[in-house]
Amino acid sequence: MPKLGVSLFIFLVLFPLATLQLDGDQSAGRHAQERGEDLFKMYQYLRRALERRRTGEDFLEECMGGCAFDFCCKRSLRDTTSD
């Protein structure tokens, strides 16, 4: 009889706990996906900023108008004005 109790406890309590995903586990995947999209957008802005930096004055004019990510423009402005 004790063997039956142990096996029932394992299959009815421990097995479902090990196989079910909690809400916290599911939301972590969603946030990781959102961060990945943000990284891709930041990469696009950085790439565009570096391409504009090669053209010179066009980059300075556009960056003064505003940028979605100010840190790339401020850093690039600092680099171009120090020359």
UniProtKB/Swiss-Prot annotation:
PTM summary from the entry reads: Authors of PubMed:25600641 studied the activity of this peptide with the C-terminal Arg residue, which is probably cleaved in the native peptide.
The answer, when asked if Lipid metabolism is one of the entry's keywords, is no
Give Gene Ontology CC terms: extracellular region
Can you name this protein?
Conotoxin Lt16a
- From the Swiss-Prot or TrEMBL record, state where the protein is found: Secreted
User: Where does the UniProt entry say this protein principally localizes?
Assistant: secreted
**What range does the record give for the signal peptide?**
1-20
GO MF annotation list: sodium channel regulator activity; toxin activity
Biological role: This toxin inhibits both the TTX-sensitive and TTX-resistant sodium currents in adult rat dorsal root ganglion neurons. The inhibition on TTX-resistant sodium currents is stronger than on TTX-sensitive sodium currents. When intracranially injected into mice, the toxin induces tremors (50 nM), spasms (100 nM), and death (200 nM).
Similarity comment: Belongs to the conotoxin M superfamily.
In which tissues does this protein get expressed?
Expressed by the venom duct.
Keywords of the record: Cleavage on pair of basic residues, Disulfide bond, Ion channel impairing toxin, Neurotoxin, Secreted, Signal, Toxin, Voltage-gated sodium channel impairing toxin
The organism's superkingdom is given as Eukaryota
- Keyword Signal (UniProt): yes
Propeptide residues? 21-54, 76-83
* Domain free text: The cysteine framework is XVI (C-C-CC).
